[in-house]
Regions:
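Metalloprotease/metallohydrolase-associated module, dominated by Zn2+-dependent proteases
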Residues: 6-34, 62-196
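Active-site recognition of the HExxH zinc-binding catalytic motif
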Residues: 42-58, 74
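Membrane-interface helix-loop junction between the first two transmembrane segments
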Residues: 31-45
């Protein structure tokens, strides 16, 4: 359902988007309060994207990089994947269709939620308490991605500080994306009321 340049915006469409933005705000609030940053359904999809990222970056696991890109590839892909859709929705279509800034902001929110997930993973580097896919915690196994990354970079003792920065950026990005998503609907609401 698109609004056209000449036609009136569909009121139901506008209110559905407002409801979605409200839901995303609530899910973000819940994720930032949750110890694991979990968002129902989204977190499961993101785990698959994270694991795919490791495979995607395997060709870059050459000895020069010491496998760093394979390890980093999971988190990097998890955060970057939604940004592909941000770019897609912000591009003006060849057929002249308008950009969908609202959809782009929903995808930016998704990327921010993924960054929160990565921050939680990073913060666990030394503690090793998160449960991994193999059923063991990082402490019980040979560590996890962020333990290995930060150890290799000599930054392990800064895991929680780095994670706080990631979390802060994720929080600001969540708030900005939801605000921008709502902002895109204001002219449509105003136009809809004038036409009623």
């Amino acid at each position: 359902m698109r609004t056209t340049e000449n036609g009136p915006p569909r009121t139901l469409h506008i209110y559905a988007r407002l409801a979605l933005a409200t839901l995303l705000a609530w899910l973000a609030w819940r994720a930032f309060r949750d110890e694991l940053g979990s968002v129902p359904l989204v977190s499961d999809i993101d785990l698959g994207i994270h694991e795919f990222g490791h495979m995607l970056f395997m060709p870059f696991g050459i000895p020069i990089l010491g496998g760093t890109m394979v390890i980093l590839g999971g988190s990097l892909t998890q955060v970057m994947f939604p940004l592909i859709f941000v770019v897609y929705f912000l591009r003006k279509k060849e057929d002249g269709a308008r950009r969908d800034v609202f959809a782009a902001m929903v995808c930016l929110w998704w990327s921010a939620i993924n960054l929160l997930d990565v921050a939680i993973y990073c913060a666990d580097s030394r503690a090793g308490q998160l449960m991994l896919l193999n059923g063991l915690t990082g402490e019980e196994s040979d560590g996890h991605d962020w333990y290995n990354l930060l150890s290799g970079w000599g930054l392990l003792e800064h895991d929680t500080a780095i994670a706080r920065w990631m979390r802060g950026i994720a929080g600001l990005t969540c708030m900005a994306s939801i605000t921008a998503a709502l902002w895109t609907q204001l002219p449509l609401i105003s136009r809809s009321r004038r036409e009623d």
